[in-house]
């Protein structure tokens, strides 16, 4: 009997969370909006909408605003979300450093700092990371109204449901319970996610894919990875890790990849691989304005934009191989838009046509029809993916319900 009662209580809590999320989502994404409009769009009873909006108002999560009636008569009362008073500490943990940014709930950055983290063990990295977060919070104490979440994104394999880091490319981790440890240290709701998957979600909320529900983001940096959005949600699969596009084999006779295979996309389309190819060609005597002392990815992109033949050839070469992998992904997922992210997009006028050429010849006609291939709008906001995890938790009701109950 007790089991049935507990299940019933659980179901009631879930319904409360889902209904609250439905109302908050409409206010956040379509506000100013009236209670009548919320009831119509959510298909909730007007009494339920009134109750939920009262709770949100009392908690300070929404506010009422006057809107001029279309008839010119009495002003109608509408509702918008209150974004200024609730803050998230968003962390992008890299291989050697951390970028920490303070966001309000609109996605506005209130401050950002960079911290070197050269540690090489799980324990020392966690200790240094937590010291950096504590220092950051102390530095921004005057701007902080209410800290509602800490979110961390990182490269590697992550179990977002359990909040556990399974693998990182540069240090050995053993089921690193990062979320539980953050909660214990800072006493605030915490999240962890994969950096590129989270960036794809951020692009959906704030960037180039706001206007579509299905998209693919491919980012080139130290490695090459993808984030896939399906029906407005990150596609994660059973264990939370999907999108290793960098390990699609595009050249069976190619270089050996760190994963152990040969000819992975990452051996061609990652910053280090691009820089290495340019150095090889320069050493072989190919003419270019680039020099061995200055052939960073940024310098290569600038040279390509200026028409440097060697730089342009290298970027086009990357684009063709990247295009092959992107074409495979398009045929699998049929997205509404493809986004390319990373420093290489500085040479988008050279890169994108090479990718598009592959799409035109290797993707089903119906799938490539009216399919935009664009560059990321969030390239210079490295921690925005972490904030997207907190935003999602507000929109799906998980974090929202905790705030209403606190």
Model-found features: residue ranges?
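ATP-binding/phosphotransfer module of carbohydrate and carboxylate kinases, centering on a glycine-rich
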Residues: 1-67, 71-146, 253, 265-406
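Short, acidic Gly/Pro/Ser/Thr-rich loop/turn segments
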Residues: 96-98, 157-159, 225
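Short, acidic, Ser/Thr-enriched surface-loop or helix-capping motifs
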Residues: 104, 160, 229
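Glycine/GP-enriched mid-protein hinge/lid loop-to-helix segment characteristic of carbohydrate kinases
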Residues: 112-114, 120-125, 174, 181-309
